Each structure stands twice: as C-alpha cells, then as structure tokens.
Regions:
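Generic N-terminal targeting/processing segments that precede catalytic cores or assembly contacts
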Residues: 1-159, 163-165, 360
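A structural signal for small-residue-enriched, beta-sheet-centric alpha/beta enzyme cores
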Residues: 4, 8, 15, 165-172, ...
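Surface-exposed flexible segments
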Residues: 80-82, 222-226, 358-364
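Generic domain-boundary/flexible-linker signal
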Residues: 107, 157, 218, 263-265, ...
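Short, amphipathic C-terminal "tail helix"
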Residues: 342-370
Length: 370
C-alpha cells in the first residue's frame, strides 16, 4: 500500500501579522524592509516570511504577508495580512487597531474585552516582542501604533463563527503556536470554546450544541433559545463536552442527526465519518434490546445507513430513537462527570422531526441511570 503523503503545515494569521508588523517597524527605523522577514514563534522556532507588499512614507510603513495555511482547509488561506505601523506617542507602548476586514469584539466572555480589535493575546504578545527586540537593537523607544487589516475579511468572516461570538466587521487574528496543523480543526474547536465563554459571561443557563443546521434550527425552535446559546459543535462533541466539564453551564442539550447521535451512543466523541462509521451489528444489538421485531434485526445488521434503520424500526412500531438517545446520554454524561449540569440528548431526522429524546437529568446521576 502506498503511504499517504505528509500534509504541509501552515502559518496562523497571528504569525503572518507579526511578520508584517516586524517588517514595517524595521522599515520605519532603518528605511529598508527586510524581505524575507524572520520571526520567532512562541515555541522558539524561527521562520521567514516573504512580503507581498511594502510601502514607506515619512510617518508610516506598510507591509503585508499572504496567509499560507498549508494543506489545512482554512477560510483565511490566501488572505492578505496587511499591517500599517506608525510611531506612537512617547511612553504609549504598542497599541492595536482593527483596519479593514479585522473584527471588533462586542460581547464579554472572550479573551479580549468588548470594544477592542479581535487580535488575540498571543499574536499581540508576538508583535510586542518583535517590536521590542528591534527597538532594543536600534535604541528606539518601542512605541508603535499597529493597524492590522485583511482586505475581503468581512466577507470571509461570514464563513466563520465570529458573528455568533459577537465579533463584528471581520476576521480575528488568531494563533497560540503560530503554526497551523492540517485538519486539526483547532479553529473550529476554539470557536466552540469561545461560544461557551460568551454564553457564560452573558448569564445564559442553557446552551445547545448541534451537529448541523437542521438540528440547530430544530432545537432552537423547541427550546426558544437565543443565538448566543447555540453552539455549532459539528463533529466535535468531545471537544465541547470536555470544555463544558471545566466551564459548566446549568443545562446542556446535544442535538444531532440520527447517524451522528448513533455514533455518540456507540462511544465516539469525534463524529466525523473519517474517524469511524456507524457500527451496524452494534446497532442491531441495541435494536434487539429495545424490543424491535425479530424479523428486522438481520436487515438492521446489514443496513446501509442509520436513517434506513430508524425507518425500519418506526415502520414496526419501535421507538429506537429513545433507546439510542439514552445510550448517547450515558456516554456524554461520563465525559461531563460530576459537573453541575443537567444534560439532554435530541435526535432529529433530515426534516428536523424529533426521532428520539433523553430528557434533562443531572449528570451526577449517570451511575444510577446506567
């Protein structure tokens, strides 16, 4: 068998912005742009970036870097990270401003307070460090006004969860290591965590994680939830639950399609099809335990889709969805352990019709419910 090729890593928006800021500040101090420009990542690695643009005037320098996400399907891949840098007033330090396409935080609960540009703490520190190092080399004060912009960023942001997090006007400048690991989906999981933070800061006591648009629409209608209570967890139920364990919310609903909730019931915390399919022999055993007619057990064992199984069970008068929801509840409750949370599981079909439910119960009761 031919081995799969290694996937190419990329660079975060924070790393790209740091490189552009360093090049711009160097130009203000020396009159020349370093190209390529080398930066040090938080882990100590040095890497160089080629400049896409550069311009220098008496009062400002502008440099830009094209975001390369490697082989990761990142919406910001190919975006232009542009930094315009001016010398700040004496003693002002480094200040940050959102230019075109960079968002502004409007809700509490994130690492950056409302009113500030959506430039996360690690990228801010990376930029401050790069400026401080250059300032020390050239005996300069190190005061700088840093404006970051991403042309087209506001349109790109509609393909992210920024709007739901209360980040308006564009994208966030992100990254904790400076490196994008392909298909780690760290940005999505990061957004889930920040969604929980925003909900908690807003006093929301009931959040709902959904696997997709159909289940989100259905659970929102069922519980009349505000948008800030909705967590687009996708396949990452494990990442959501682990964060909720240490950042609890009184009530949690997990809502999803029958196939993904069946995988949760079978113990999977990553619901992506690449991580594993529905175990149909296991589903047949669950159907038998739930009291499904004997004549459909073998067809279930050899079914092609979970939807087909639920249709078979429904046609023979068995509420298989409730049994699957109950088992999914036990799996999810085990992750939450003894957090002060009541948990609910909802299964929906493709039309948004409820197919199974395990109602709210405190997760500390899970041992009694097994």
């Amino acid at each position: 068998m031919k081995p799969e090729p290694l996937l190419r890593r990329g660079w975060t928006t924070g790393a790209c912005a740091t490189a552009a800021a360093k090049a711009a500040y160097a130009a203000l101090l020396t009159g020349h742009f370093p190209d390529p420009v080398e930066i040090t990542l938080p882990g100590g690695q040095n890497t160089a970036f080629t400049l896409a643009e550069s311009a220098l005037s008496e009062t400002a320098a502008m440099a830009s870097v094209v975001k390369d996400a490697g082989d990761d399907p990142d919406v910001t891949h190919g975006a232009l990270l542009r930094v315009t840098l001016r010398i700040g007033p004496p003693g002002s330090g480094v200040s940050f401003h959102a230019g075109e396409g960079v968002g502004t935080v409007t809700r509490p609960g994130l690492a950056i307070p409302p009113g500030e540009p959506a430039i996360n703490p690690v990228p801010r520190q990376m930029i401050r460090t790069a400026i401080a190092e250059l300032a020390a080399q050239h005996c300069a004060p190190g005061d700088a006004i840093v404006e970051i912009s991403i042309p087209g960023g506001e349109a790109l942001a509609t393909r992210t969860l920024n709007g739901r997090l209360g980040i308006t006007g564009g994208l966030s400048i992100l990254g904790t290591t400076g490196i994008v690991i392909p298909f780690s989906c760290s940005a999505w999981i990061h957004s889930i965590h920040r969604g929980i933070d925003v909900a908690r800061a807003g006093g929301i006591t009931h959040v709902a994680g959904s696997t997709g648009n159909v289940s989100e629409t259905a659970v929102r209608a069922l519980h009349h939830l505000p948008e800030a209570a909705l967590l687009e967890m996708g396949d990452f139920v494990g990442g959501m639950l682990k964060y909720l364990k240490s950042h609890p919310v009184p009530r949690v609903t997990i809502a999803g399609g029958v196939a993904k909730m069946t995988k949760l019931a079978q113990g999977r915390l990553d619901l992506h099809s690449k991580r594993g399919e529905v175990d149909f022999p296991g589903l047949a055993a669950a159907a038998q335990t739930a009291g499904c007619a004997p004549e459909i057990i073998e067809p279930i064992r050899h079914a092609n889709t979970a939807a087909q199984v639920f249709e078979l069970a429904s046609a023979h008068g068995t509420a298989l969805g409730d049994a699957i929801a109950a088992q999914a509840w036990r799996v999810a409750a085990a992750v939450l352990e003894d957090s002060p949370t009541e948990l609910e599981i909802l299964l929906f079909d493709r039309t948004g019709t409820l197919q199974g439910r395990a109602g709210f119960a405190p997760v500390h009761m899970r041992k009694r419910l097994v």
